[in-house]
A protein has these predicted regions:
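Short, structured coil segments at secondary-structure junctions
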Residues: 40, 64-65, 170
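Conserved core of the sugar-phosphate nucleotidyltransferase
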Residues: 44, 102-186, 197, 201, ...
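N-terminal glycine-rich phosphate-binding loop and ensuing alpha1 helix
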Residues: 2-48
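Short beta-strand segments
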Residues: 8, 95-96, 126-127
Length: 240
């Protein structure tokens, strides 16, 4: 059974334009993101847009050895469906490029848990009930389920955010993939200037890009002054 990681990336972020090509320790956030995913041992596809602004994203992703597809900016679900049709995985892991410190080992364990369940209709995620820091999120589902969502989802938030049609379906079985500790209060995602400030400090001064999930949380626990840099940031709600 072929599994692929599909990650979405674009330059035109509303709160932090060009964020995926901003740098920490001389390396772009997209490079950090893709490097962290190598621990999952899975092929990675970068789904970006057809906008000219995203040409550098496509060029860099290709240079780094990732697959690349380009599609609609706002209909991100169709972009993922395009990736599925082009690369033909049986199983999809969805992540987003605003997670430069994602833990590939955690992703791999999530894929194994999904496969062990033996149900192709299953939706699995470590964010159904949050225990991991925001920025380590991933989702696992069959390519067939993704294509079904692409055919049937009509609401704008469902198209823009890719998976709501799956995880809001009461009839669909779901598997939460919790951690043994609750670190959900921590934020190591990249959406605002404050997030970028924190990530740059974590990477450049504390080698966070070399730490696994447990190491990241231990680091944050030891430095509450760093946690405070972006503690006030509110995550966008569905439809925003």
């Amino acid at each position: 059974m072929k599994t692929a990681v599909i990650t979405q990336a674009r330059m035109t972020s509303t709160r932090l334009p060009g964020k995926v090509l901003r740098e920490a320790a001389g390396v772009t956030m997209l490079e950090h993101h893709l490097a962290r995913l190598t621990a999952a041992g899975l092929p990675v596809v970068v789904a970006t847009t057809t906008n000219l602004d995203d040409d550098p994203v496509a060029v860099l992703a290709d240079k780094l050895g990732a697959g690349v597809v380009r599609g609609s900016e706002h209909d991100v679900l169709s972009r993922f469906a395009l990736a599925v049709r082009e690369f033909e995985p049986d199983v999809v892991v969805r992540v987003t490029s605003d997670c430069p410190l994602i833990d590939g080992d955690v992703v791999r364990r999530g894929v194994d848990a999904w496969a062990a369940a033996g149900d192709p209709t299953l939706y699995a995620s470590n964010a159904l009930e949050r225990t991991y820091p925001r920025g380590l999120d991933f989702e696992v589902f069959s390519a067939e389920a993704l294509l079904e969502a692409d055919r049937l989802a009509t609401e704008t938030p469902h198209r823009e955010h890719v998976t709501p049609w799956l995880y809001t379906d009461d009839a669909r079985p779901k598997l939460n993939l919790p951690w043994e500790r609750d670190a959900s209060a921590y934020r190591i995602t990249l959406d605002t200037p404050e997030d970028m400030q924190l990530l740059r400090i974590l990477i450049e001064e504390h080698d966070a890009h070399r730490l696994d999930a447990a190491g990241l949380v231990t680091l944050l626990e030891a430095h509450p002054e760093l946690v405070g840099i972006n503690a006030q940031i509110e995550q966008k709600k569905l439809g925003q």
